[in-house]
Amino acid sequence: MADSAVPYSLGPSARASSTHRVATGTKQTSALKRRDASKRQAELEAALQRKVESERRAVRLVEQLLEENITEEFLKECGMFITPAHYSDVVDERAIIKLCGYPLCQKKLGVIPKQKYRISTKTNKVYDITERKSFCSNFCYKASKFFEAQIPKTPVWVREEERPPEFQLLKKGQSGCSGEVVQFFRDAVTAADVDAYGAFDAQCEPASSSTWSERASDERASDEEGPGFVSSLLPGNRPKAVGTKPQPHRQSSTVKKKAAQKMTSKHGEQTVSEVTEQLSNCRLDSQEKVATCKLPAKKENTQISSPGPLCDRLNTSTVSENKHSVSQVTLVGISKKSAEHFRSKFAKSNPGSGSASGLVQVRPEVAKANLLRVLKDTLTEWKTDETLKFLYGQDHGSVCLQPSAASGPDEELDEDDISCQAQNTLDETLPFRGSDTAIKPLPSYESLKKETEMLNLRVREFYRGRCVLNEDSTKSQDSKENELQRDPSFPLIDSSSQNQIRRRIVLEKLSKVLPGLLGPLQITMGDIYTELKNLVQTFRLSNRNIIHKPVEWTLIAVVLLSLLTPILGIQKHSPKNVVFTQFIATLLTELHLKCEDLENLAMIFRTSC
């Protein structure tokens, strides 16, 4: 009992001591926490201070790099305390103040181009010169990019524990680049891609017949909807084949039809070399099909079998394909629409290729007849009485020939021509030519007499001041006035201004061809311009007879010059005229014309209108 009563009596003191120990431990723990928190805060403030100081130091270095006379050692030291973004700011700021973007260069920037791209004819590449504009030369641009690539990308405030990198600078004399190369397409298909594609197909399961039939139908549909023009061989600028998922739809149609069927039948028995050999054979066979394919025509079916540019191109492409790798070229199919278009182009390019060239070429006789007919019609429309008065004076009727009434010396008139001529002469004598005026019946004599008396009476009353108009007549006059007010007429076209424009056009065209004709005559354009202008002012010009080809204008100038020769005072048998005659004869020979043709054109101005 005594033993058990001792702890019971010590209970309050023990509880007090334990409470004191707990309170003491809590105070110590809180003190440690406050100490750790203050320590962490101090460390955080120190880290933040280092970060701010590092950023300030980087900004100061950026400002110092904007100055001139920067040494290599200083630039290398700055590379440890800046980032690529800071260096880009240095380049931009130096470009703004018209300094070269490379800190070691002290040159000024000249005229900065405004374009974004530059095409190099030496390398056949397109360069993006957006960043290149900030440098004075290609070397400075390359040296700057070389130094920028060595700058660490880590934050500047964590580099104290890192090992400083060893910066290297480009030496002078090393070539630079014009900018970043613009990639318009991916790399071409290589032999490794073809081998990988063949090995993967050899491991794949054989495709079903329905799949190949669907692909064949798709290829036929694509052939029918082919492009407008065809090139037999194109450089193989296609994407590289992926090793896991090749895309057979992007390959050539011949590879789908022949090589794929053979590879699926043999599975994995074929090697890579055999697959490559089969691909080359398929391409050669498809070339023969393109060379001997039948081209559709509307009237008759023809086949290109004669030697021409197409056959030569296919032969050369076949030889080059045997020499080079198979994967460097890609075959393009030919469609029906493209074949027809190519056949027309082939016919135009080969003048002696049968009946197709006969449709394109025009015989010299036909061209000569058309030329003379156009010139004759034009000069006939131009000729007026004023033209004859200017050339031959007021009494041109005695000098000029009368136009023949008969249509031809050996032509006989039939009954229809005689009746037509009689009808024409009758129409000229009568005051009216048609039967439209005789549709209404003629008024009687009594009605005409009464109408005449009424008119005389109204005239007498008008002079006496007693004339009173009827309501119907006044209404009709008012309605006519209203109609005139409602429907204003447009101003007439100034025909004289139109003629002035046409005369100016004719004089400009003649002024372009006359200097070459006036050389043998040893006269200038100013000597004949006044007479030529006066002659053109007498022409009857329209919007159709002033449009001619250069050859036609040359012949027109020759005709007009022959008409103005007497007015200019050039004698017929003078040495100048003899040289001019020889020159004109040479010109007519080149145009497949004769002197008689030129005389016939000049005879138009020697006949009366």
Curated annotation (Swiss-Prot):
Single Gene Ontology BP annotation: snRNA transcription
Species of provenance: Rattus norvegicus
Coiled coil start-end: 33-69
Annotated EC: 3.1.3.16
Reactions that this protein is recorded to catalyse: O-phospho-L-seryl-[protein] + H2O = L-seryl-[protein] + phosphate; O-phospho-L-threonyl-[protein] + H2O = L-threonyl-[protein] + phosphate
Enzyme class: hydrolase
Stretches the record annotates as Disordered: 1-37, 208-272
Residues engaged in binding Zn(2+): C100, C105, C136, C140
Name of protein: RNA polymerase II subunit B1 CTD phosphatase Rpap2
Keyword Phosphoprotein appears in the UniProt entry: yes
Bias type Polar residues, positions: 15-31
Role this protein plays: Protein phosphatase that displays CTD phosphatase activity and regulates transcription of snRNA genes. Recognizes and binds phosphorylated 'Ser-7' of the C-terminal heptapeptide repeat domain (CTD) of the largest RNA polymerase II subunit POLR2A, and mediates dephosphorylation of 'Ser-5' of the CTD, thereby promoting transcription of snRNA genes. Downstream of EIF2AK3/PERK, dephosphorylates ERN1, a sensor for the endoplasmic reticulum unfolded protein response (UPR), to abort failed ER-stress adaptation and trigger apoptosis.
Similarity annotation: Belongs to the RPAP2 family.
UniProt-listed Gene3D superfamilies: 1.25.40.820
Taxonomic lineage: Eukaryota, Metazoa, Chordata, Craniata, Vertebrata
